[in-house]
UniProtKB/Swiss-Prot annotation:
GO CC, one annotated term: cytoplasm
Reaction catalysed by this enzyme: guanosine(2445) in 23S rRNA + S-adenosyl-L-methionine = N(2)-methylguanosine(2445) in 23S rRNA + S-adenosyl-L-homocysteine + H(+); guanosine(2069) in 23S rRNA + S-adenosyl-L-methionine = N(2)-methylguanosine(2069) in 23S rRNA + S-adenosyl-L-homocysteine + H(+)
Protein name from the UniProt record: Ribosomal RNA large subunit methyltransferase K/L
Organism: Acinetobacter baumannii (strain AYE)
Family: Belongs to the methyltransferase superfamily. RlmKL family.
Gene name in the database record: rlmL
UniProtKB keywords: Cytoplasm, Methyltransferase, RNA-binding, rRNA processing, S-adenosyl-L-methionine, Transferase
Amino acid sequence: MNTSLRLNHYWITCADGLETLLQEEIEQLGTKVTERKAGRLIIEGTLEHAYRICMWSRLASRVLLPIHTYELERTHDARDVAEELYEGAISFDWSLIFAPQSTFAIRLHAEREIKVNTQFATLRVKDGVVDSFMEAVGRRPSIDTKQPEITLYVLAGKTEHTYCLDLSGDSLHKRGYRRFMTDAPIKENLAAAILQKAKLQERNPEIVLDPMCGSGTFIIEALMILTDRAPGLVRRFGFNGWHGHDRELWLSLKAEAAERHEKALEQPLPKFYAYDADWEAVKATRENIIAAGFEKLLGDIQIEERTLADWPDFGAENKTAFIVTNPPYGERLGDKASNRSLYLGLSALLQKNFPNQYAAIIAAQIEQADVLAFEAPETLRLMNGKLPIYVRFGTVKPEKVTQPFLANWQAQPVEMEEAQDFANRLQKNMTALKKWATKENIYCLRLYDADLPDFNLAVDLYGDRLHVQEYAPPKKIDPEKAKKRFNLALAAIRAVTGLNRDAIFIKTRARQTGTNQYTKQSTANKRFIVQEGKAKILVNLTDYLDTGLFLDHRQMRLRIAQEARGKHFLNLYSYTSTASLHAALGGAASTTSVDLSNTYLSWSKENFVLNGLTVDHADEQHMFFASDCFEWLKEGHEQYDLIFIDPPTFSNSKKFHGTFDVQRDHVSLIKRAMNRLTSEGTLYFSNNYRGFEMDEEIEALYDVEEITSETIGPDFKRNQKIHRAWKIQHPGLN
């Protein structure tokens, strides 16, 4: 059955989740929405209304004019649907819509209940249109699937098939400016929807920042909104070959849009910042901005290759800022853990640089969005193609200015009948360390380390949490007696520090052999962030015997941070690569971290991402290798200016053939590493083996200086044997 053509009835399609925003936009354009369905709005209006939506809608996907409805009288199977679509197509005189010399294409969509081979059914619709032309005028149009002059949109339904003329031609999200692509881009209409949901124009910002700009979509869409630039001003449409096209009407709307844009350009614009860690993305952004027609505005747009760790001083204290970005989730980054660290790092940067300013951040998982520190957050779920995304909107909370725990701690009288000596010693240590920790901003330090023989434990402070390690008692000590003493010590720790039970994490530490330190102790996975120098570091006080941060090497890491600028840094037995992190934040030209454990290298990458540094091997700035260090040194030839080696005392990993003994093997290890050290470079070698002696061969071959005293902080002065460290250089430098 053929229904007559109505020029006041249109379908406006959109991505799932945009229906409400699209309805608001359409009604602002002066058109009434009469019906709303998932991914589609139906309007009643004139051809001018449809043209205005084509010209001005930033959110719509397509503007469709239903021109023919074929009502069904049969039940469905796959073959019936295709034949019905053919019958529906041939039953309409398509020569009334477009000329046979025009090219056309078919876009077929089926409702969920309809099972049909869309490729075959599309061919049958094409056959029906062509056969209709042959019957009507004796000539047939040609198919062009890439740039057709006419696009027919067909919806296969349960009771009827609807044939529409696609006035938009190509999807309206294609504005015509995207000349260069990056991985996992955001569609233009979704970017515009996010900006409109965030009320960009009403906020009238002085700064617009996209710190991970990709191909520049957010920056360009913001420019279009703030300069009143119609998204359809310079693109092709699907109505030019339509017999019903009103060319004069369209040209008048186009002239009106151009005039509005020129007038808006006379108004002051915010300063735009478009950053990305990938040079190709920076290049794509610049080229796309030019392609969008904003070349004259490049002076107002700072487009630079920058990581999150390399933000400038925006001078935003007294300015209104708007931050929007599509972080490299999923395809653009990798595992969920690294993604979460990225959002934690971004949130911290926003709190520091843009407190009380408005932001809109895309996330692939809701858990990523949840770590963003926003006041009164709102979340919008959208579909970016087939990929669900979550957009978190909100005002950035101000940064919490924290001081080291000891800065605010005050000694109080403590009475502990059976553990008074321990309580007094712990309090004495904390009092002695308070001034140093406060002055140097030390957040993580050792408070007690088996100072008294009856209390054989270590107490470490990580931020505002305690890590208490009970050293395994000698066999001659009664286990019940040892347990009682440990419980007394815990009570004293709570009394002296004032910390609750949930801030104290307890482990038993035995002598380490092989890879015990890498054995998981629990599955709690409760990691949190601590500060050391410029670095934010993830620590875990529950899952492993070691926490992810060796406190005794703090001074060495800070030394590396001071010496690393402009240098190529190598970290062997890197563990969670905190030394590499300090080197990177200190301005190292590159860092390379080598460790046998994939678990700790993954943790390493999270530390880097948390601090806004890239971990993509493609740029070769920060590299991570899961390898035996001996083999890795043997296979490569790259030279390094600064090398740090902190090997285990002993190792017999399943991944490593044979064993490693630091006393036995340090000569060959150091010699291989020195072969990779530049002529004027420095190698730092350290280990925790109390009986270690540097071999005379190393002292004969190189300039060797023991610097142990320089690498032990005040919190470890009570235990001078915690580690030993040497500075090693090629002969003749001193």
